[in-house]
């Protein structure tokens, strides 16, 4: 059976030929590059905003020929406009990356070469270290008893505890935890590995602790909705897919009760997983595999957090000590 064609994009600021190529470009990124729907949505939004800007900047609808003749000053003006809107540096980097990708796609398709895009330097982004939680705090966030006083149904409290236990216990992204199907999560004593689908639909195997599986099983036994094997294991209050925002709100309530900083987010549990493994002597390459990072340089950011431990190792092991 052939795949359904992607819906045609309509643009008020650009010629239909641009809209057609934009549709083909996003379809290509989804099918060939396996970019996530959220990334495709962001790339599409960035290109729309650029085309809207150029239409206003030039005083005419953007055509393929005009876009191919784009000048560096046009791109810089667009980036300056976005920066004036207080857009973060990382978002500006993504916008420029998307525009360059679209330009390369047009060139490969013989629609023209947008040379100006390669002449623009990517905006500088200050690197900030992840903010892991202390080990005791991370454990409390994954403890169902900490939620006992909340005025919510007990099965929902058990669900939230199970999700956070997976984030900290296996280093999952929140999208990965909520994307797990019931058949993919073993019962306690029947397995100790999860097969997780991460960014770019790449799968990886991660170990899971038996006490974490016990929390998941406790939630499953309390859940009032049927949880078919091929359906998501975590569901919302009405039995539908569980939104990441619900877990974020649960974290906000709990960090207030526990006196934790605003940096205590669901993703901070993943950071804590990596940092605590490293502090206990975990191998950086093994942690890279567990996190699903394609590049070791991404994982190496955690060495900055744990520099104190590395200095201790140096002091105790250096041959000239």
UniProtKB/Swiss-Prot annotation:
Domain Core-binding (CB): 16-107
Source organism of this protein record: Bradyrhizobium diazoefficiens (strain JCM 10833 / BCRC 13528 / IAM 13628 / NBRC 14792 / USDA 110)
Main location: cytoplasm
Subunit-structure text: Forms a cyclic heterotetrameric complex composed of two molecules of XerC and two molecules of XerD.
Pfam annotation, one family: Phage_integrase
Domain of life of the native organism: Bacteria
Record keywords, A-Z: Cell cycle, Cell division, Chromosome partition, Cytoplasm, DNA integration, DNA recombination, DNA-binding
Family label: Belongs to the 'phage' integrase family. XerC subfamily.
One of the GO BP terms on file: DNA recombination
Localization of this protein: Cytoplasm
GO CC annotation, single: cytoplasm
Summary of the function given for this chain in its UniProt record: Site-specific tyrosine recombinase, which acts by catalyzing the cutting and rejoining of the recombining DNA molecules. The XerC-XerD complex is essential to convert dimers of the bacterial chromosome into monomers to permit their segregation at cell division. It also contributes to the segregational stability of plasmids.
Active-site positions on this chain: 173, 199, 267, 270, 293, 302 (o-(3'-phospho-dna)-tyrosine intermediate)
Coiled coil (UniProt feature): none
UniProt key word Cell division: yes
Chain's gene name: xerC
Name of the protein described by the UniProt record: Tyrosine recombinase XerC
């Amino acid at each position: 059976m052939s795949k359904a064609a992607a819906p045609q994009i309509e643009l008020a600021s650009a010629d239909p030929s641009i809209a057609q190529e934009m549709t083909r470009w996003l379809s290509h990124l989804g099918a060939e590059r396996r970019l996530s729907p959220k990334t495709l949505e962001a790339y599409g939004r960035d290109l729309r905003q650029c085309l809207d800007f150029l239409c206003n900047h030039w005083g005419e609808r953007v055509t393929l020929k005009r876009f191919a003749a784009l000048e560096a000053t046009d791109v810089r003006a667009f980036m300056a406009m976005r920066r004036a809107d207080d857009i973060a540096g990382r978002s500006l980097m993504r916008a420029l990356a998307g525009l360059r990708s679209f330009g390369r796609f047009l060139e490969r398709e013989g629609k023209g070469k947008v040379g100006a895009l390669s002449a623009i330097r990517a905006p500088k982004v200050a690197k900030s270290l992840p903010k892991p939680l202390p080990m005791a705090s991370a454990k409390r966030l994954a403890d169902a008893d900490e939620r006992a006083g909340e005025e919510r149904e007990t099965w929902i409290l058990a669900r939230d505890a199970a999700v956070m236990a997976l984030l900290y216990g296996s280093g999952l992204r929140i999208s990965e935890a909520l994307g797990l199907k019931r058949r993919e999560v073993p019962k306690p004593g029947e397995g100790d590995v999860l097969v997780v689908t991460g960014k770019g639909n790449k799968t990886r195997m991660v170990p899971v602790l038996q006490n974490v599986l016990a929390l998941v099983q406790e939630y499953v036994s309390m859940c009032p909705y049927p949880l078919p094997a091929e359906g998501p294991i975590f569901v919302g209050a009405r039995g539908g897919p569980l939104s990441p925002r619900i877990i974020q709100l649960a974290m906000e309530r709990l960090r207030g009760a526990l006196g934790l900083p605003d940096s205590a987010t669901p993703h901070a549990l993943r950071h804590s997983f990596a940092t605590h493994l490293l502090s206990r002597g975990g191998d950086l390459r093994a942690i890279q595999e567990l996190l699903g990072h394609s590049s070791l340089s991404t994982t190496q950011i955690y060495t900055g957090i744990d520099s104190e431990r590395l200095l201790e190792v140096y002091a105790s092991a250096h041959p000239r000590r």
